[in-house]
Amino acid sequence: MPKKYIFPSELSWLSFNDCVLQEAADKTNPLYERIKFLAIHSSNLDEFYRVKISDLHSIPEKSNLFEKVNKEINRQQNTFGSIWKKQIIPELQENKIIYYENQSLLPLHTEEIDSYFKTTILSYIQIVYLSEDENQEYFLNNRQLYLLIRLKNTNGEITYCYINIPADKLNRYKLLSPVKGKNYIISIDTIIKKCLHYIFPDQKTSTAFAIKLNRDENYLIEDEASGNLVSKIKKKLQERKSGSSTRFLYDFNMPEVMRKLCKNAFHLKDYEMIEGGTHHNFFDLFKFPNPNFPDLQNENFPPLKYFPFETKKSIFEVIGEENQLLHFPYQSYHYVLQFFNEAAIHKDVTEIKVTLYRISSQSLIANALISAAKNGKKVTVFVEVKARFDENNNLFWANEMQRAGIRIIYSMPNLKVHAKVALLTLKNAGKTKNYAYLSTGNFNENTAETYTDFGFFTSQKEYTDDLKQVFRFFKTKEKNYPISNLWVAGFNLKENILQHIDIEIQNVENGKKGAVFMKINGLNDKEIISKLIEANNAKVEITLIVRGICTLLPGINGYTENIKIYRIVDRYLEHSRIYRFHNDGAEKIYLSSADMLSRNLNRRIEVAFPIKDKKNHAGD
């Protein structure tokens, strides 16, 4: 029997996506920001089908949960469609932006789309005819958009085929010429539908319906410890392209005969066939064109300059004097880039060590590391090639860095390195000094513009000595190194969190105040949940801000009545992790890369670091 204070993780995740949908419906948000929230919702749901749904229908005891999940997804999809059709499109029209769907085109726009189709779109079109032979094999690419087409020739003969919509090659939405003060936008889906007569000139009629297939992109390497792990990952990445289907999305207008045809041709199960709208992949709305209406978007907030880094020529001079804490994107991420760029050319820098989990495709940091190696610095980079959906990008940069002479340490068996840390060694006049950067977020200058994270620079030995031990572990795989100041998953992180909650419990039992605050992205670890319930029953004040999955339900008498749980969904993606313990008034604050998820605490290397400077502590 499930515990009444536990909420299924799949439904919790969907509740987060529902919050995103609420932002899309919130008219206090600018119109194009609401369109962006629809794109986020669509992207999130697409990932849900790629990595989470397969387990539900493969485990018999989860069949009831599978039904609840489908019911919630259907509810959200109906809400999504209503927001798009009844709110967004009419409000676009109010702002003189016409989105073409089923309406007739103006003559000028007919000429434009004909030209664009013939010169550009048509070069990508591939036709696959469907036969009645059940032994014939057909393959739909994962997440690719297609049109399933019913053709009828002059003799009344009917054939079926499907063609690709090249949204992976071209912008999904095209801005057409303005007419009489109005702007016009059309999707390439609609352009193709209106130009089918160019593809099938001998057919009397043609009717097209949107289809799309999601495939399971979870992969499991049975034995990570033996053989070459990187080679195994590369093989799995190839296999992922042809993973089993998890969702076949089709236009709700599609006739039953065509649905049956799809089921047979693509070997689909009933539960995989899901009714959708006339268009799929709404995450392409990220690039929905804005003709020139800045007031329909959020006002631009340029990041603040950080004065201490502006007053000295060398960033190391500033860090050497005092610890420095930055909050992104409110403060500029350029200082992180400056840290690595200056290290690459600084005459005193002899060695650089860094962990890379998710880096940008055009990474300035990776390029700085390459320059450092070519400038004679000793550079060691731990590259996590098991970072989901970033495996290929990480492998690419690992190869580029290796070619430049950088020592690359790859993923470890049965363990992910999720820590975001760097350690630099400087030597001058016979003296050696280390500088460290620790962060809650990835070394990624692109996501740093939209994710809230903290970055901490220090040269204090209590931090740098512990980081030396962490990097030594990456090299030797041994854990017999003392780590005292940092909390490191796999070493002492979980134990320290449990111990500090125990201290708050003890303080309350001694008549003092006890309080725990955590801002995290997920909570499902059973030991942490049990300890929070114990603290709840001891009357410890517990406040949690959990962006994503949270399997703990607040307000359950006898378990969580003293626990407050909030979720923040807003302009920026909340990504930072903060642990705060009242500690009888001498509060302790840790920033971390780790959520309170079992995978973070038990199967990853994470680093939490204390913020001891009172100037960086917010008031109650």
Feature names for model-found ranges:
Residues E541-I545:
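Hydrophobic alpha/beta core scaffold segments
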Residues K526-I529, I533:
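Glycine/threonine-rich ATP-lid/beta-loop region of ATP-binding domains
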